[in-house]
A protein has these predicted regions:
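Conserved N-terminal Rossmann-fold NAD(P)-binding element of oxidoreductases
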Residues: 9-10
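N-terminal Rossmann-fold NAD(P) dinucleotide-binding loop
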Residues: 15-16
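Glycine-rich FAD pyrophosphate-binding loop
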Residues: 23-43
């Protein structure tokens, strides 16, 4: 197989994941990013499903769990701020075969950045 040099525009979640897999398959990804450093901030991500399967194949479940935020429950409220119902996260996690974490977007990005060989 010929090694390809592949330019990836954007050092975010998708860019670093793609760079990781291209490198695994023997190619030479080059990630370019407009920002001077990893971007901080962003929303909380409920991480499960297909994304979990990919992280498992990358061997990053332990890193993901180390960054996880534990919440006692998920609360649903009406427009007056009154709680309608609560679901505890232990129930959600159990229903998902323990393949669930909540973490911030920038924490996931950092995990993926660290997983990519630094010659990329």
């Amino acid at each position: 197989m010929n090694q390809l040099k592949i330019l990836i525009s954007g050092g975010g979640i998708a860019g670093f994941t793609l760079a990781y897999w291209l490198h695994q398959y023997g190619h030479r990804p080059i990630v370019i990013e407009q920002a001077d450093s990893l971007r901080t901030g962003g929303y909380m991500i409920d991480f499960t499903g297909t994304g979990w399967d990919v992280i498992e194949k990358m061997g990053l479940v332990t890193a993901l769990r180390q960054k996880a935020h534990d919440f006692p429950y998920l609360s649903f409220e009406n427009d007056k701020g009154q709680t309608i119902t609560k679901v505890d996260f232990a129930t959600i996690t159990k229903a998902l075969d323990d393949k669930y974490v909540a973490l911030l977007r920038d924490e996931l990005q950092e995990i993926l950045y660290e997983a990519v060989p630094h010659e990329v």
